[in-house]
Curated annotation (Swiss-Prot):
Packages the positive strand viral genome RNA into a helical ribonucleocapsid (RNP) and plays a fundamental role during virion assembly through its interactions with the viral genome and membrane protein M. Plays an important role in enhancing the efficiency of subgenomic viral RNA transcription as well as viral replication. This is Nucleoprotein. Residues 213-230 have a biased composition (Polar residues). Residues 18-148 are annotated as: RNA-binding. Residues 228-342 form the CoV N CTD domain. ADP-ribosylated. The ADP-ribosylation is retained in the virion during infection. Its main location: virion. Belongs to the alphacoronavirus nucleocapsid protein family.
Amino acid sequence: MASVKFQPRGRSKGRVPLSLFAPLRVTDEKPLYKVLPNNAVPQGMGGKDQQIGYWVEQQRWRMRRGDRVDLPSNWHFYFLGTGPHSDLPFRKRTDGVFWVAIDGAKTQPTGLGVRKSSEKPLVPKFKNKLPNNVEIVEPTTPNNSRANSRSRSRGGQSNSRGNSQNRGDKSRNQSRNRSQSNDRGSDSRDDLVAAVKKALEDLGVGAAKPKGKTQSGKNTPKNKSRSGSVQRAEAKDKPEWRRTPSGDESVEVCFGPRGGTRNFGSSEFVAKGVNAPGYAQAASLVPGAAALLFGGNVATKEMADGVEITYTYKMLVPKDDKNLEIFLAQVDAYKLGDPKPQRKVKRSRTPTPKPATEPVYDDVAADPTYANLEWDTTVEDGVEMINEVFDTQN
């Protein structure tokens, strides 16, 4: 069964405007924004300051035995201020949209319009050669398609007149074949209806049905998830100050091993990151961005490959703060190593309850060269903390 068209037929209110140019298609599985340059604007229309617009993705698929089989997407070009996203400003991050512009273009609506349904799309031409894995979809001529349909209609009528003489002898065979073809046709119509409904929902026409346990039938296309245009970057590809250790991306993967200026976190914290027990309590004593910027000192130093930014911040935490004990236990915790497992003591028949004792923490000598967290116990009302964040990223 053929794939669903991008442009729905008829004069419905939710119809998508037609592009002036034939679409592009990537032959491999890479998204368009990774293979097409950001100045790929089709030539031949508008002035120099109007060479700006966007490519929008049209998802394609086929229905095969009631299942949806994904096909390579088509990408249609629209000038800025036209098309299905005419209200978006230039470079507004949107799924399925790739913004392009040529130097000298103005970031304002071009007013170049869209194509009429009776017009043939233009073959896009570019200043530079397209990549090998990008092809132009051959445009179709609406008038020729209508002429072919009329010729097929006339041919069908003439054949029906010639076959009418033999209907008497073949009526019984036709009745049997008709019942079988109706069964097959009903399945094809169900597949087509389901595919059209899915296409209209993807284009924003009509309200999408809420997910539930009910199913329309065995031929209903399955909703297979598709990855968005913007893919999630791995932790190692992000700047260090944007990383969040979680799951397989441990503290060592994101920030390196403990030592030197990186002196916070026990072995459990390093292994589990933000999912470690007690992390939320310890993080509650970390100053926010506004506190670092407006309540501390900011120093910069120009390096060979970037600018080094150093934040210095002091804060006084009351000793009775419920999260302070957890926080202090993580400072220089890597120097203590993993605690040895304690042997289980067999309980006697008449165990004697032991008085509860408060945990005692060993004092760890601070290294004045690398230590970035210090506390002063001489303060009467609490603990004074000094936080210096070293950032050597670009």
